[in-house]
Amino acid sequence: MRVIHYLNQFFGGLGGEEKAGTPLETRDGAIGPGKLLEQLLGAEARLVMTLICGDNYAVENQEALIAAALERIRACKADLFVAG
């Protein structure tokens, strides 16, 4: 199963409030808490991508964020999307 994980800027390792305006970024594989998530999902699951976005950017640009995230999810052919 191909999994994509969405994290905010803090849990994605970008920083705190000073990075809250960061637009959507993509990283290959598991980042931060995604490493534990991958273990918990078991051998059948592989966390193929992590999406990271600043909290303030997400609130102020919801439509653009959703469109960009869906584009990446579809392109990656993910079976599961986990936010948080």
Model-inferred region functions:
Residues 1-84:
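Metallocofactor- and cofactor-centric catalytic cores in central/energy metabolism, strongly enriched
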